[in-house]
Amino acid sequence: MIMKRVLFTILCIVVAGIASAQYINRVFDYKPAPGQFINVSPWGTPAAIDGVIGGVYGNMTLGAFGGYVVFGFEAPVENDPQNPFGVDFTIFGNAYSNWSEPAAVFVMKDENGNGLPDDSWYQLAGSDHFFSSTKINNEITWENPGGESALDIPWSDNFGNSGLLEVNEFHLQSWYPSQEFFPEIDPLEYMLSGTFIDTKIDTSSQGIVKSYVRTFGYADNHARGVGDHLIPDNPYTSEIENSGGDAFDISWAINDLGEYVDIDQIDFVKVQSASMGSAGWLGELSTEICGAADVAPDPQLKGEDKVLVMKDLPLVLKSSSLQLESAFFIDGRVVPDARFDYAVSSDIAYVDEKSVLHVEESGILSITATLASNPQYTCTQECVVELSTGIEMASDDPTFSVFPVPATDFVNVKSVRPGIYHFFTGNGQICLSGELETSVQQIDVSHLTPGFYFLSVIYSDGKQIRKFMIQ
């Protein structure tokens, strides 16, 4: 009898937990930007709405910068500090390791009680929000190139920039939202406004494209985990511990002045593509979401609540100086008076008292930011430095390539002219050198530890560097 009572109690707890789970209940607005999945079901038509309601395995694209969706839950989502890691809901996308298509997230409380998202939006400020590269109220106007097939789409913004969203060979339909599926979008041009964050796209490895993950606070940024999707991940650590996806704390909300605001609960969520970039054969960066889930209280599930974030260095630094930026967060809120110390891995560079990096020659750099008040918190960034030698290589000069990537015991280097090669570790140490012959040369790297390396080839008229991986 006692055993039956115990089992009955456990069953009741489990059933109660399932019953309390909240998912997207209603989509109020879906207005995507152009993109490769637009006008294609199920990702890029209104049919995608049904997929994201009631679960976390739908398929909805928001397109390139500015595309958005507004949704709500059946009941308000409470800002509950008793939730795991203090987070209140999780949004799931189709991100994976080294591939992020980040979206900004906004929340709204139904203050007038009419059940509609017509009150004030508050952005949940993510890890990159306070960096100088982030643009608030970035407006992009998309122009319809016409026709029913894929054509490059012109765009311009309110900062004087313009360009083309370049189509690829894999999606041949028009990438501009069609009147058939999106009659409310102007068939000639339309403007989308939102927060832009600078993302880091790496195409240095042959056949491999990476869009590096932001630390926290953006949708379609972290991969889905294998754990219960109702048990969130800690947004302040890099490991995927539970559900994966991207967990959000309502306490990250800021107003139009960039000031944190206290909101006890929210009724509506807006997810909006926040990046702009081409990933080569993979197409444009475009946020996708699969669903969202409310988080239930569990005060026993706790973890790290502080994180140091350093603004991305360029993949290749071609200037002799660069302003470094870092931010320190406690419970996802930035600490405004935090101070940082910087250390560099090589004597080719130093950081001055104003956090400006000064570089004296080309090479490989690893820079570590440390919280001055607590050296436990650090963040490291790497980059290749290519300063001008005063001799410009002609545009038709051959380059060299490295394959396979990743390599194992051997790496092949293909070049049509001789040179001197150096293999560098991530911290700038030379670990292998030699003379590079013409055509294809096989180099033994079996003695090198798996990880990322840089191959520098010095020609008679300049230097070139490639990044590759050994596994």
Predicted regions, residues:
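Short, exposed coil/turn segments at beta-strand boundaries within extracellular/luminal domains
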Residues: 372-380, 459-465
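Extracellular/luminal low-complexity segments enriched in Ser/Thr/Pro
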Residues: 354-362, 369
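Residue-level detector of functionally pivotal "anchor" positions at catalytic/ligand-binding pockets or at interdomain
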Residues: 302-310, 384-403
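Acidic, glycine-anchored loop motifs typical of Ca2+
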Residues: 111-120, 138-140, 149, 157, ...
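C-terminal outer-membrane/trafficking sorting elements
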Residues: 392-403, 407-471
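A domain-level signal for the mature, folded cores of soluble proteins
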Residues: 22-101, 126-302
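Solvent-exposed, low-complexity, repeat-rich "mucin-like" stalks and linkers
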Residues: 305-338
